[in-house]
Amino acid sequence: MNLFASLNQFSKNRISWLLLLLFVVFFEGAALFFQHVMMLSPCVMCIYERVAMLGVGGAALFGLIAPNNPLVRWLGLAAWGASAYKGLALSLQHVDYQFNPSPFATCDLFVTFPDWAPLNQWAPWMFEAYGDCSKIVWQFMTLSMPQWLVIIFAGNLVALAFIVIAQFFKSK
């Protein structure tokens, strides 16, 4: 139970939210490195997964505002959970496109963002897709990029679960 009390205290500290933000910056930087340096074309699913990761970053920024305020902290945790869950669902679907190809199950040809937030028009260098979702263009330790994203987003949800449980324990 000491672990949960420590996690509760840690979640009320700006450093915890800053670490989450740095995690997102690292992975977004890696995505841009793959795209612009290694010249790997991002697909539609890659862009949606990138947006989900940015959602985790937005949650981290929100939590940074006032981590001692329970409302702000819980809203940050909820946004983190929603973004990580959406990222996991997208990554699992992307893995399915890669390893169970079907002419009936394909990703869109173009990214579709709402009219009020056309990210691919505002920042095409980051949000424009021109790759094929079913192609495996990169692997590390025999896992494709979407498989790594499944691990990353699932890891986020596991970490989030521990932190949410810790909210019900008294701080040290």
Curated annotation (Swiss-Prot):
Q: Where does it mainly reside?
A: membrane
Source species, domain of life: Bacteria
Cite the InterPro entries for this sequence: DiS_bond_form_DsbB/BdbC, Disulphide_bond_form_DsbB, DsbB, DsbB-like_sf
Periplasmic compartment ranges equal 34-51, 93-147
Q: Which residues cross the membrane?
A: 17-33, 52-67, 75-92, 148-166
* Record Gene3D superfamilies: DsbB-like (1.20.1550.10)
Q: Which cysteines are joined by disulfide bonds?
A: 43-46, 107-133
- Give compartment(s): Cell inner membrane
Task: Give any GO molecular function from the UniProt entry.
Answer: protein-disulfide reductase activity
**Residue ranges annotated as Cytoplasmic topological domain:** 1-16, 68-74, 167-172
Q: Which Pfam families match?
A: DsbB
User: A single GO BP annotation from the record?
Assistant: protein folding
Q: How does it sit in the membrane?
A: Multi-pass membrane protein
Query: SUPFAM superfamilies per the record?
Result: DsbB-like
UniProt GO cellular component terms: plasma membrane
Keyword entries, A-Z: Cell inner membrane, Cell membrane, Chaperone, Disulfide bond, Electron transport, Membrane, Oxidoreductase, Redox-active center, Transmembrane, Transmembrane helix, Transport
Question: What job does the chain carry out?
Answer: Required for disulfide bond formation in some periplasmic proteins. Acts by oxidizing the DsbA protein.
What PANTHER family does the annotation carry? DISULFIDE BOND FORMATION PROTEIN B
Q: Which family does it belong to?
A: Belongs to the DsbB family.
The protein's name in its UniProt record:
Disulfide bond formation protein B
Q: Which organism is it from?
A: Vibrio vulnificus (strain CMCP6)
